[in-house]
């Protein structure tokens, strides 16, 4: 039975990656051994996890938790929280670190905003994170659909809404005007890593374009908190990390997340290095000294992990294990 499951999982991963070209992975003979601190705690009672999954399936919705193989899925689902992924489950880009399906996406589901709102109401949650696949096939990159989702959710629910958006191909003026119709409480766009590695890690993205999106949104909608995140372990240097944090802060970002990159499968980019806990603590100290209100740094930290906690509670200590 286990062998059959392994085969099915392998086939699913290969199907996701059949268009992605990742160089030199076949030449990697040894995989880095995971250190002791890279351990995922599985809850004993999984009934809540299946309840969330069934609610998503029932309404034909997606969670980035599942699609991106997030290590925190069990904990978050067990606590009744999920990060919803709109605009389908197929991404138009082929970032080799990401487990989300890549290819030609389906047409936008105009019923999704209302289904999303109804599901959030049924789940009874008070903080919502919405993200999406990259939709370079759409003129506005999906911005109008984000707005429609925000409207639908707020019409039925008294919740705070955080959106984690793509770069919209740099159509910043268009995007800013569209979001004037409905604003989130937090605007998040992940920078992911250092500019030197962008071509390898984020083909199709541009470091300065991402910074400009964050800066422009903050200038136009100053009441909305702006947020960004990095994943480490792909070959970046300490001095580069510090410079990225300074660039983000200069662009108006006040909330920061920094986590460890974990290879979704053998077909994705390999981990170059596992960051020790002490280094995450140092990164957090540096971020707070730069001026960030909140800096959440640790191996399992993700942009939407404990997002409601991140959004309103300034953290001025270095205990990453309290998160």
Swiss-Prot record:
Top class in the EC scheme: transferase
Pfam families: LIAS_N, Radical_SAM
Subcellular location: Cytoplasm
Cofactors, names only: [4Fe-4S] cluster
Alphabetical keyword list: 4Fe-4S, Cytoplasm, Iron, Iron-sulfur, Metal-binding, S-adenosyl-L-methionine, Transferase
InterPro entries the record matches: Aldolase_TIM (IPR013785), Elp3/MiaA/NifB-like_rSAM (IPR006638), LIAS_N (IPR031691), Lipoyl_synth (IPR003698), rSAM (IPR007197)
Keyword Metal-binding among record annotations: yes
Disulfide bridge partners, by residue number: none
E.C. numbers: 2.8.1.8
Entry superkingdom: Bacteria
Binding site for [4Fe-4S] cluster 1: 65, 70, 76, 304
Binding site for [4Fe-4S] cluster 2: 91, 95, 98
Record's keyword annotation contains S-adenosyl-L-methionine: yes
GO annotation, cellular component aspect: cytoplasm
UniProt family annotation: Belongs to the radical SAM superfamily. Lipoyl synthase family.
Protein name according to UniProt: Lipoyl synthase
Organism per entry: Buchnera aphidicola subsp. Acyrthosiphon pisum (strain APS) (Acyrthosiphon pisum symbiotic bacterium)
């Amino acid at each position: 039975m286990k062998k059959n499951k392994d085969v099915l999982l392998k086939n699913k991963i290969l199907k996701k990656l059949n268009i992605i070209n990742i160089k030199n992975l076949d030449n990697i003979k040894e995989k880095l051994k995971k250190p002791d601190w890279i351990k995922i705690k599985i809850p004993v009672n999984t009934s809540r996890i299946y309840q969330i999954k069934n609610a998503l399936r029932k309404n034909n919705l997606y969670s980035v938790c599942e699609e991106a193989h997030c290590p925190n899925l069990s904990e978050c689902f067990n606590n009744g929280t999920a990060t919803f992924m709109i605009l389908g489950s197929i991404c138009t880009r082929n970032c080799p670190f990401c487990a989300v399906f890549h290819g030609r996406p389906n047409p936008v589901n105009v019923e999704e905003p209302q289904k999303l709102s109804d599901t959030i109401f049924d789940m009874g949650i008070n903080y919502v994170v919405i993200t999406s696949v990259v939709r370079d096939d759409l003129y506005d990159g999906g911005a109008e659909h984000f707005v429609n989702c925000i409207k639908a959710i707020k019409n039925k629910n008294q919740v705070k809404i955080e959106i984690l958006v793509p770069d919209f191909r740099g159509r910043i003026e268009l995007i800013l005007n569209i979001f004037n119709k409905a604003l989130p409480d937090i605007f998040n766009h992940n920078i992911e890593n250092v500019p030197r590695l962008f071509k390898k890690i984020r083909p199709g993205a541009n470091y300065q374009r991402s910074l400009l999106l964050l800066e422009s949104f903050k200038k136009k909608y100053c009441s909305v908190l702006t947020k960004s995140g990095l994943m480490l372990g792909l070959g970046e240097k300490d001095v580069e990390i510090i410079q990225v944090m300074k660039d983000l802060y200069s662009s108006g970002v006040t909330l920061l997340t920094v986590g460890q990159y974990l290879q979704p499968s053998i077909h994705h980019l390999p981990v170059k290095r596992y960051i020790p806990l002490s280094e995450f603590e140092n990164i957090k100290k540096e971020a707070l000294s730069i001026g960030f209100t909140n800096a959440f740094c640790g191996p399992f930290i993700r942009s939407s992990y404990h997002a409601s906690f991140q959004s309103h509670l300034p953290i001025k200590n270095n205990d990453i294990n309290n998160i």
